[in-house]
């Protein structure tokens, strides 16, 4: 489907020369003299190469049809990460390139939004937070309650984060998936 270049936003998927690109940033530039242009910074989905393109705002760009659906994470193996559509029970395998930084936060049975193009996974959207267990952290020292200093900790998925001094190993905590930061102690 052709759309005006000026209508593209971050996250849009564009088909250029038979290859898919995801828009990382889109900026409409209106110079004092001349034609307004749209500057697109994109990443090629197949190999991760970043490209920058400039279009007149009225130019038409081929927008790829992307299907965003809920999928349940099943497991990962040498082939990739396996997901199931809970409505049709169809299974899809996403590669490590598609999953990227989301890999440590995937848990069996977790519902994620998987973006596909022609039934090939191209992007994943995790839930905003996950509950993980602290496996290792320094013991808290008495009398440190006045300061708001955080201490390093290792989560059950191997990711390092910082937690308040009263959190001990074995405690379940809520973690933001976008940056791995501590939110709160998990409620049982």
UniProtKB/Swiss-Prot annotation:
Cellular compartment(s): Cytoplasm
Keywords assigned by UniProt, alphabetized: Cytoplasm, Elongation factor, Protein biosynthesis
Signal peptide annotation: none
One biological process term in Gene Ontology: peptide biosynthetic process
Highest taxon of the lineage: Bacteria
Keyword Phosphoprotein: no
GO cellular component term, pick one: cytoplasm
InterPro entries associated with the record: Elong-fact-P_C, NA-bd_OB-fold, Rib_uL2_dom2, Transl_elong_fac_P/YeiP, Transl_elong_KOW-like, Transl_elong_P/YeiP_cen, Transl_elong_P/YeiP_CS, Transl_elongation_fac_P
Pfam family, one: EFP
Pathway as given in its UniProt record: Protein biosynthesis; polypeptide chain elongation
GO molecular function, one term: translation elongation factor activity
Stored HAMAP family: EF_P
Protein family per UniProt: Belongs to the elongation factor P family.
NCBIfam families: efp, PRK00529.1
Function of the molecule: Involved in peptide bond synthesis. Stimulates efficient translation and peptide-bond synthesis on native or reconstituted 70S ribosomes in vitro. Probably functions indirectly by altering the affinity of the ribosome for aminoacyl-tRNA, thus increasing their reactivity as acceptors for peptidyl transferase.
Name listed for the protein in its UniProt record: Elongation factor P
Organism (species): Caulobacter vibrioides (strain NA1000 / CB15N)
Name of the gene: efp
């Amino acid at each position: 489907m052709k759309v005006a270049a000026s209508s593209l936003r971050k996250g849009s998927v564009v088909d250029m020369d038979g290859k898919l690109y995801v828009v990382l940033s889109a900026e409409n530039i209106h110079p004092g003299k001349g034609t307004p242009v749209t500057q697109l910074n994109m990443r090629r989905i197949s190999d991760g190469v970043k490209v920058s393109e400039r279009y007149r705002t009225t130019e038409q760009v081929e927008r790829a049809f992307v299907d965003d659906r809920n999928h349940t994470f099943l497991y990962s193996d040498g082939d990739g990460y396996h997901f199931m559509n809970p409505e049709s029970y169809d299974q899809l395998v996403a590669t490590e390139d598609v999953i990227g930084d989301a890999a440590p936060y995937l848990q069996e049975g977790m519902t994620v939004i998987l973006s596909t193009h022609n039934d090939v996974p191209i992007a994943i959207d995790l839930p905003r937070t996950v509950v993980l267990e602290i496996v290792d952290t320094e013991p808290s020292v008495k009398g440190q309650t006045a300061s708001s200093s955080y201490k390093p900790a290792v989560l059950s998925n191997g990711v390092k984060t910082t937690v308040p001094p009263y959190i001990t190993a074995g405690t379940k905590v809520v973690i933001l998936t976008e940056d791995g930061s501590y939110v709160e102690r998990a409620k049982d």
